[in-house]
Design a protein with these regions (language model features):
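Hydrophobic/aromatic anchor residues within beta-strands of the central parallel beta-sheet
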Residues: 1-3
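A short SAM/SAH-binding and catalytic strip from SAM-dependent methyltransferases
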Residues: 5-10, 14-33, 52
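Class I S-adenosylmethionine-dependent transferase superfamily signal
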Residues: 37-38
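Short, structured coil segments at secondary-structure junctions
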Residues: 41-42, 86
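Conserved beta-strand signature within the Rossmann-like core of class I S-adenosyl-L-methionine
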Residues: 42-59
């Protein structure tokens, strides 16, 4: 589906055995309505992946570095509670991802979407470049830049209908 999940309707999509929503529900405001639609579309199973609690370490630390308020997405337990209140008793699994994110350059690290460059002014972007230069180190095997603070952390929420 090539549109935002919060904009889909059951009437235009119809029934499917499985609905998979990977990394597409973080930050959606009408989350309960979106979950109801997803649940209605699915005949057998729903699988959702969300950012886990460790996913935002580097962003949180950067905001502290520039003394800016951190505004994180609601954590996965928020969605779990909404599902529970809807009568859906979902399974939760934290996916064990071992690799750190790697970047070919500071620019790539800045532009990966994690830092929301569109919300930073020029001074904050310069501070971000400085911050990344301080914390990123080169992987001797791959030659790419990484930090232990920037590791993917994913939560799988699923249920059987």
């Amino acid at each position: 589906i090539l549109k935002s999940l919060e904009d889909i309707t059951y009437e235009e999509i119809g029934d499917y055995d499985v609905v998979l929503a990977s990394r597409s529900l973080n930050g959606i405001i009408p989350i309960e309505e979106t979950l109801k639609t997803i649940n209605k579309i699915a005949n057998k199973y729903v699988f959702i992946t969300l950012f886990g609690p460790e996913n935002w370490k580097i962003e949180k630390e950067f905001n502290e570095y520039i003394e800016k308020e951190n505004k994180p997405f609601p954590e996965y337990n928020y969605m779990f509670n909404i599902l529970y209140n809807m009568g859906i008793y979902a399974n939760i699994e934290r996916l064990d991802i071992k690799a750190y994110r790697e970047y070919s350059s500071i620019e790539e690290a800045m532009d990966n979407g994690k830092f929301r460059l569109d919300l930073l002014n020029d001074d904050e972007k310069a501070q971000l470049r400085k911050y990344l230069n301080e914390i990123l180190k080169k992987n001797s095997e791959t030659g790419k830049l990484y930090t232990e603070k920037d590791k993917a952390d994913w939560i799988l929420i699923s249920w059987k209908k």
